[in-house]
Design a protein with these regions (language model features):
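Short, structured "edge-of-domain" segments at secondary-structure transitions
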Residues: 1-401
């Protein structure tokens, strides 16, 4: 080694010896250790001084975490069927689909929504209950999967049916109508609950009564009974109350029941009428007489001396409406243009020879935040009216006393 190398090595040895002695001192003397820690912390504070963002407490009683923030936000499609099946489909599976979704034989889609996993769905049942369903809890399926019955999410009774479902959006009002003519209006936010594990009351019903209609508030309300009467009045006549209230009389029920209650908006042109004798017709809404709530109403089908025509289904429609006909064996669709436009005196025209179980309008695809969006509806061009063909029996019955 050169003289210079020897000097450098001796200096390095002295430095290491001093460091070893200092480390021994820190480890063996608690006072020296604390003094070192203080000086180093002061140095950190001097170089990186920022206001403290955390709070130090001796004891923390409760930590609140919003579980909704922990749910991954993902756009999905939710399908609800007439028989009460529900499924959540990823957008990728939905966009790749080329066919209709899989359903049980005789079932059909009632609602289809585009929303995200942090949203909620409101489903109303025939027994006057509602289900507040977080979308993220719905079983995820492929578009071609059947899905699960809604009772797998929230238990409902065997005889309880889902009558309508909605995307939960504050600021919207719903109109609820019962079979015995009770009616009320409820703000959608009134249905929000923190516990979603059981059905909640949406309307107080009497024995043997049931909820038959839940719709978003429209400008006018049209009630139709099974003995062929209608009542048209302003929706503003319906009071706004809470979920547990019974509401007020919308129609004076005696020996009849309300079969349909519709909310009328600017896009609606007709009321579609279907009878127990497999006849159907469309009546222009503009031809109906407007009265006030809780009146007897006017006839929507004239009385027949030999045939007991009774309305089994009725709903508002426009030129885009597709009618879903559920029979004992199958489900078929009829375009609105295939149903004749008639007046309130006519019986309608035969549209099938099969035993009809139910008739509903085909679902309209709904998106979160766009449920109140006004969609321009083309007006139907009426064909020249042909002479009505009626049987000699119906003609003579019109003159019987």
């Amino acid at each position: 080694l050169t003289n210079t190398d020897i000097v450098v090595l001796k200096e390095r040895a002295e430095e290491l010896q001093k460091l070893i002695e200092r480390c021994h001192e820190i480890l063996s003397d608690e006072g020296v250790l604390k003094s070192l820690m203080k000086s180093e912390l002061r140095e950190v504070k001097k170089n990186y001084a920022v206001p403290r963002k955390t709070e130090i407490k001796d004891e923390i009683t409760e930590i609140k975490v919003d579980l909704k923030d922990m749910i991954p936000k993902e756009d999905v499609i939710v399908v609800v069927t007439n028989d009460g099946y529900i499924k959540k489909v990823p957008m990728k599976s939905f966009k790749a689909a080329t066919d209709e979704t899989t359903l049980k034989p005789g079932d059909f889609v009632r609602n289809m929504f585009e929303l995200n996993t942090r949203d909620y769905i409101l489903s109303f049942t025939s027994l006057g209950n509602y289900l507040f369903i977080p979308v993220h809890t719905i079983t995820e399926c492929k578009w071609k999967d059947l899905g699960k019955h809604i009772s797998n999410l929230i238990m409902i009774k065997e005889n309880e049916r889902i009558i309508n479902s909605f995307i939960f959006e504050k600021g919207t009002s719903l109109v609820l109508t019962s079979k015995e003519g009770m009616i009320k209006k409820v703000r959608m936010e009134e249905f929000e609950v923190s516990r979603c594990s059981k059905p909640m009351t949406s309307i107080k019903l009497k024995d043997n009564d049931e909820l038959i209609s839940v719709q978003k508030e429209g400008k006018k309300t049209l009630i139709i009974t099974d003995n062929n009467y209608y009542l048209l009045f302003e929706t503003g006549e319906i009071p706004e109350v809470g979920p547990k209230a019974s509401g007020v009389k919308g129609y004076p029920i005696k020996d009849n029941n309300v079969i349909s209650s519709s909310q009328i908006n600017d896009s609606d042109e007709y009321i579609n009428i279907f009878t127990n004798l497999n006849t159907a017709k469309r009546v222009k809404l503009s031809e109906l007489v407007e009265l006030t709530r809780n009146k007897k109403g006017k006839e929507i089908i004239k009385k027949n001396k030999t045939k007991d025509y009774r309305v089994i289904s009725a709903f508002t429609s426009n030129v885009r409406t597709i009618n879903v006909i559920k029979t004992n064996d199958d489900v078929n669709e009829i375009k609105n243009s295939d149903i004749p436009i008639m007046d309130s005196n006519s019986f309608g025209s035969t549209y099938t020879k099969l035993k009809v179980v139910n008739v509903k309008p085909k679902y309209e695809f709904e998106k979160i935040g766009k449920t109140n969006e006004v969609v321009e509806t083309p007006k139907e061009v009426e064909q020249p009216k042909e002479e009505a063909q009626i049987s000699f029996e119906d003609f003579t019955n019109s003159f019987k006393i």
